Amino acid sequence: MSKDIYYSDKYYDEQFEYRHVVLPKELVKMVPKTHLMTEAEWRSIGVQQSRGWIHYMIHKPEPHILLFRRPKTD
């Protein structure tokens, strides 16, 4: 199922590195509606990315799109 997960390219501002992840419809029901996911939670539904990414925002009109960020390291 994780083969159907889409990972955006990374994009940046002065402070953070960002990316969004688009889930297939069958995984949307596993996304909590009440809170942002911990790393353990997003990994448990099949999202695979390096450590340090934070699920930082819920975009209610599109719950299948997960928004992540992490501090820039350069």
Curated annotation (Swiss-Prot):
Question: Which keywords describe this protein according to UniProt?
Answer: Cell cycle, Cell division
GO terms for MF: cyclin-dependent protein serine/threonine kinase activator activity; histone binding; protein kinase binding; ubiquitin binding
Database matches in SUPFAM superfamilies: Cell cycle regulatory proteins
Give the domain of life.
Eukaryota
- Enumerate the transmembrane spans: none
Cross-referenced Gene3D superfamilies: Cyclin-dependent kinase, regulatory subunit
- Gene Ontology CC terms, in alphabetical order: cyclin-dependent protein kinase holoenzyme complex; SCF ubiquitin ligase complex
Q: Which GO terms describe its biological process?
A: anaphase-promoting complex-dependent catabolic process; cell division; female meiosis I; female meiotic nuclear division; histoblast morphogenesis; regulation of mitotic cell cycle; spindle assembly; spindle assembly involved in female meiosis I
What is an example of a Pfam family matching this protein?
Answer: CKS
InterPro entries xrefs: Cyclin-dep_kinase_reg-sub, Cyclin-dep_kinase_reg-sub_sf
- Which family would the database say this protein is a member of? Belongs to the CKS family.
Instruction: Give the function comment from the record.
Output: Binds to the catalytic subunit of the cyclin dependent kinases Cdk1 and Cdk2, and is essential for their biological function.
Quaternary context: Forms a homohexamer that can probably bind six kinase subunits.
This chain's protein is named: Cyclin-dependent kinases regulatory subunit
Source organism of this protein record: Drosophila melanogaster
